[in-house]
Amino acid sequence: DRLLPVGSVNPLHEIDVRGEIRRVLDLGIRMIKIHPPHQLFAANAYRGELWQLAEIYRECEERGVPVMFHTGTSVFPRARNVFADPMPIDDVAIDFPRLPIILAHAGRPLYGETAFFLARRHRNVYLEISGIPPRHLLRYVPRVADLASKVLWGTDWPSPGVTSPRKNVEEFRALGLGAEVEKQILWDNASRLFP
């Protein structure tokens, strides 16, 4: 597979969250995206009033379907960046230890250290580096090579500043991280998460 379908279920807008997540996954969706700054809840809100969020995590954990969380600030209208901090995902990783968790944008720009910490702390947490210009990657994730087996490539294309995925790959390779690190980040890690 070269293109994998990704979907989302917003527990604030669904009456039967468990039924909806099952329906979406039964369609062949391979990953669920949760976008806290735009969906307006913390990733661990299931520990309070938004218990339905746990239904999404539980179903994905049972099926081995990764959940990607937007981490890092958003400049788009109506975003609430208080929900952009990845630290609440610490609870998710503990409460759902078999759930593959992907931290989109590696917390950029304000929460990179937190995202890196979570990926190092938890076996089931991975960093995804889309939205970070490759030439600036080492500024945002200076020890990316230390975590190479848990970092996923991404471009966030099409978006401002991303002229093409090919150019992003070329800029990434120009960092000189070494062939093995590049292979893990560009291919191996995603192949393992999405068999």
Q: Which residues make up each language-model segment?
A:
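Active-site gating/metal-coordination segments in enzymes
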Residues: 1-75, 121
